[in-house]
Amino acid sequence: MRKKKFKAESKRLLDMMINSIYTQKEIFLRELISNASDAIDKIYYKALTDDSLTFDQDNYYIKVTADKEARTLTVTDTGIGMTKDELEQHLGTIAKSGSLAFKQENDSKDGHDIIGQFGVGFYAAFMVADKVTVKSKALGSDEAYVWESEGAAGYTIAPCDKETIGTEITLKIKENTEDESYDEFLENYRIKAIVKKYSDFIRYPIKMEETVNKPKEGSENEFEEVQEEQTVNSMVPIWRKNKSELTDEDYEAFYAEKHYGFDKPLTHVHISVDGAVRYNSILFIPENMPFDYYTKEFEKGLELYSNGVLIMNKCADLLPDHFSFVKGMVDSEDLSLNISREMLQHDRQLKLIAKNINKKIKAELKSLLKNKREKYESFYESFGRQLKFGVYNDFGANKDVLKDLLLFYSSKEKKLVTLDEYVSRMPEDQKYIYYASGDSYERIEKLPQTEMVADKGYEILYFTEDIDEFAIKMLTSYEEKEFKSVSSADLGIDSDEDEKQTEAEENEYKDLFESMKEILADKVKNVRASKRLKSHPVCFATDGEVTIEMEKVLNAMPDSQQVKAEKVLEINPNHEVFETLKNAHGQDREKLALYTNLLYNQALLIEGLPIHDPVEFTNDICKVMV
């Protein structure tokens, strides 16, 4: 029998497909099962247009059989089969797809779409097999043929005996090497796991022989092991069912079955789109974050299916980083089964799906926020930080998408509020959205800088996470109201009379403040009379964009450049301490230095900043006490 050569640059092309397109050897079984499913689909389609054919789905199946002794793995289908010419065309030409040609010829619009449109999947078998044998008998033919190949060298086609319509593909599994073990592809448990992973939702039964224990005939207490044919795939994916048929329990069972999380999901979104791009999707928003969520080990992404066949465990391109907590899957008939990660990044359909999913997630979160506030706050406790990162990242590109999902603790309401809720309560004379930063709500409430804003009756948002101020700086404003830190030099509250009084105090005590600035040198940008303090003697204000809390965050980072906020030491001119400062300025330079350093260190402590010289600080306290 003469060996024929493949109709392509076979060795180079075969090597490229095996080594580049497929990154995991187990993929070969997914490809063979998908081809088998296509073969049955073709009979189904023909039956729709040919009255002489009937399609009883119970008669159609795929069977996978392993033989350890012979080192063979066989995939059998009851599909349409192939003639000699079709074997030549579809298996003799690498990257020739019979399914694609069939689809183009028949232009199927009945929803029974064909998976294998790309003609390379079959050759994945050579990743695990030394030899591939294909026996096939075509529908309407009396003859059967066998196609055999040991790889790039070529193939043979000859007549063979086969009674039933369909195709039988037998792989002679490779022997183990030092680097690779191929025995796993002869183990039933491993084969079953691969089927469940990639082909669980193929619409036809995938059968395997399973070893089960059954009572011996005529004996109640004795059991024997027998081989029994069982269907190992689920066949009907939940995402193709009508939403009205499904309960919350159905979705929760799917969530658990797919190992998306150890707890129940907070909510789910079931999407079915039949437009410019067709896809089905089930998305889950978890209540609790995974233990590794804020680590570099965490991988975002949704499971990606092509017509029910898994093509990627985690497709990162489907989710923006700010929604990386979402779990779930997408199934589209418009995606290539053999598409690579690199190609996915530029796939137009995938980009459309990702854009739509992004909108659906936001809509679901907004619905939770509006209608199930307690649930949303539970979610926000786990993932609010990620939403804030989303506002800050990419130079604020997503801030408009996320701003209405943010929550912050309110000084007035004593609970989390949205920016919209804050703005809706603002008095007419309030110009800014005020915020204060600190380690906890309790500490922020005691900050001296909050006194003036609070006395004015204005609401203050409390920022307790390191990302908060960075996100707000990127947001800059909400509903045309700018954000303003209570530590800002200008709070936008003073009346004209207040301005005149402050200016007069600055002029009157100019020499005192200049002396204090001289004592502190470059530790502060300036010393001045405070407009914001009521009962406290001292605090820091900041000039410029970098606040004290931002300074802490930036300087805690690796390879920090030791960023410094432009600190201004503000003194309360109405506090008793101010009289002491005035007296010391006129009489005792050393005492002024002592009091100035004490007040500076007091301001550091209020902000939670380290004192530069704790020993000197304690000595200064002792000097005051004696």
Curated annotation (Swiss-Prot):
Gene3D superfamilies: 3.30.230.80, 3.40.50.11260, Heat shock protein 90, C-terminal domain, Histidine kinase-like ATPase, C-terminal domain. Disulfide bonds: none annotated. Residues 553-626 are annotated as: C. Pfam families: HATPase_c_3 (PF13589), HSP90 (PF00183). The keyword Hydrolase does not apply. Residues 342-552 are annotated as: B. It is found in: Cytoplasm. The keyword Chaperone applies. Residues 1-341 are annotated as: A. Homodimer. NCBIfam families: PRK05218.1. This is Chaperone protein HtpG. It comes from Bacillus velezensis (strain DSM 23117 / BGSC 10A6 / LMG 26770 / FZB42) (Bacillus amyloliquefaciens subsp. plantarum).
